[in-house]
């Protein structure tokens, strides 16, 4: 009989028992003149000493503004050097950073600010077609705890980053008071109840996860990492930024949002040795019409995560992009995020058919979804993980925390997986109905809850259907209320118009079908599997 599907990650290298600020100071002392941040779209270049000086000034400015440890500060911006500056300045003084997705609309922004109790918000003035200044103003009366908003590059921002010499001693005093187990970050992950949940992460959680993601890539102070993935997500701020600062490597920001050409240009111009992305990003880069004009020979490693990588794509990444040591990671926000990772020397098969083995200091197991018993290797069950990386809980939501983390400390991911005899893990599906669109995790129930606010919708069900570009797209089945005199919701365009400005663009259903009934089980439950099968056939999609 096969052994049980449970593995313990390596323990030979100790966990970092530091705060993020302590770790940054250590790196600055070691490599003060190394490039810390190169932001090409801002024409900006900071050494580690430059960066640290700015972090200290902003930290003192935040204290002068009245913030104190454990206060929450929201950050709403695409990828700028200033995002990283705020990330480390808040960590320096124990202020909890609340990441806000740049794609959020007013409905989601107000919820995140209120649920986390943000006193302070720092934001870009705008992004793409979103006027953040106007959007913040529109929710001001809905966010009573929000005392102040400062926009990048405004006079208020310039005053904030200039710092306050009177508070510099307070910054230094706080160093001895902060604990690695203090909460330092809240990241929102949508819940099946329709309400986002704030995964609360500590210094220990995210510093160590970033450090070990870097260790498994063999990062050193000579590496230069191109980070086109968003900072608001763990992929950018933990696996990217914290992996770099804990190793003295350089963070290269190609653009404020993903752009294949700018990413390739950044790698070529800055001689990057590492590149991050979800598979769709690598596919877009490989397909770029002028791909061959960029010299990518400096590349060695990186991380691909967020969705399975097709074998053909992995081969091209290795052969055409020189990413011979690229690694695959699996994780979730609630686990800081990485639980498993492949190694640079792993075979092509391991890097396309599995998500690697247990991360250092992380335990993993495959459990029966109903009984919770550990299954034998080779059997499909729920992927569970335990260790330093598991969040302290969902912010002010003990019920949901208890549902996710059992009494033995195991985080139940909701993902279906199989563990091989060698300890590698294959993710084979999801227990929940989560849809993954271009690396973004979307929970249909959240979209359904919002669509129910339309006055003409009686019932709505949202599913994921296959898509060649994004992996999956959202589809809404809608039953309208009967006997409407002059219905306004009659087309897909009508639905898109209703969603515009209220929910993130990637949450707006790509397909809509108006129905009179839904497929049901004999006990009255919606059969989403049948809905998906019917939709695929009706739309002529390839599975």
Name these PLM-found stretches.
Residues 17-18, 32-33, 151, 155, ...:
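Conserved pre-ATP/AMP-binding loop-to-beta segment of ANL
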Residues 64-65, 93-162:
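Structural core segment of the AMP-binding/adenylate-forming
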Residues 104-114, 121-123, 275, 387, ...:
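AMP-binding/adenylate-forming catalytic core of the ANL superfamily
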Residues 249, 264, 269-277, 286-350, ...:
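Gly/Ser/Thr-rich phosphate-binding loop
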Residues 16, 36-88, 105-110, 158-162, ...:
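Conserved AMP-binding/adenylate-forming core of the ANL superfamily
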Residues 207-224, 234-274, 288:
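Conserved AMP-binding/adenylation subdomain of ANL enzymes
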Residues 45-49, 184-208:
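Conserved AMP-binding A3 loop
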């Amino acid at each position: 009989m096969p052994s049980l599907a449970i593995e313990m990650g390596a323990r030979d290298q100790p966990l970092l028992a530091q705060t993020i600020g302590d770790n940054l100071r250590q790196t600055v002392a070691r490599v003060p003149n190394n490039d810390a941040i190169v932001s090409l779209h801002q024409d900006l270049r900071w050494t580690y000493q430059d960066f640290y000086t700015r972090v200290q000034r902003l930290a003192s400015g935040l204290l002068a503004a009245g913030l104190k440890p454990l206060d929450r500060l929201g950050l709403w911006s695409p990828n700028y050097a200033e995002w990283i500056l705020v990330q480390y300045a808040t960590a320096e003084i124990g202020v909890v950073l609340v990441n806000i997705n740049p794609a959020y609309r007013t409905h989601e922004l107000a919820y995140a600010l209120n649920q986390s109790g943000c006193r302070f918000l720092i934001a870009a003035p705008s992004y793409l077609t979103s006027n953040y200044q106007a959007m913040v103003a529109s929710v001001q009366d809905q966010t009573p705890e929000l005392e102040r908003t400062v926009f990048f590059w405004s006079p208020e921002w310039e005053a904030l980053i200039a710092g306050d010499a009177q508070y510099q001693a307070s910054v230094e005093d706080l160093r001895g008071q902060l604990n690695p187990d203090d909460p330092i970050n809240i990241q929102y992950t949508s819940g099946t109840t329709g309400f986002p949940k704030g995964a609360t992460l500590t210094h220990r959680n995210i510093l160590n996860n970033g450090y070990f993601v870097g260790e498994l890539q063999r990062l050193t102070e000579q590496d230069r990492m191109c980070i086109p993935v968003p900072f608001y997500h763990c992929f950018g701020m933990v696996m990217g930024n914290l992996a770099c600062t804990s190793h003295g490597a350089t963070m290269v920001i190609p653009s404020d949002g993903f752009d294949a050409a700018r990413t390739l240009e950044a790698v070529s111009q800055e001689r990057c040795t590492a590149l991050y992305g979800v598979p769709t990003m690598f596919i877009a880069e490989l397909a770029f019409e002028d791909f061959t004009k960029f010299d990518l020979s400096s590349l060695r490693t990186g991380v691909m995560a967020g969705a399975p990588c097709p074998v053909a794509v992995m081969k091209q990444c290795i052969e055409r992009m020189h990413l011979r040591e690229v690694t695959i990671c699996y994780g979730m926000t609630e686990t800081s995020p990485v639980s498993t990772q492949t190694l640079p020397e792993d075979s092509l098969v391991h890097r396309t058919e599995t998500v690697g083995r247990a991360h250092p200091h992380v335990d993993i197991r495959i459990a029966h979804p109903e009984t919770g018993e550990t299954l034998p290797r080779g059997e499909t069950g729920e992927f569970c993980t335990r260790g330093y990386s598991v969040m302290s809980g969902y912010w002010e939501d003990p019920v949901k925390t208890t549902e996710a983390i059992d009494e033995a400390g195991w985080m139940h991911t909701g993902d279906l997986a199989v563990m091989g005899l060698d300890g590698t893990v294959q993710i084979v599906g999801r227990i929940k109905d989560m849809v993954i669109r271009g690396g973004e995790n979307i929970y249909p129930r959240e979209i359904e809850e919002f669509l129910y606010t339309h006055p003409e919708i009686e019932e709505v069900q949202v599913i994921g259907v296959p898509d060649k570009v994004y992996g999956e797209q959202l589809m809404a089945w809608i039953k309208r209320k009967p006997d409407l005199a002059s219905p306004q919701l009659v087309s897909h365009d009508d639905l898109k118009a209703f969603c515009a400005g209220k929910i993130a663009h990637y949450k707006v259903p790509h397909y809509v079908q108006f129905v009179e009934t839904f497929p049901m089980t004999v006990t009255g439950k919606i059969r989403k599997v049948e809905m998906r099968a019917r939709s695929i056939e009706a739309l002529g999609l390839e599975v």
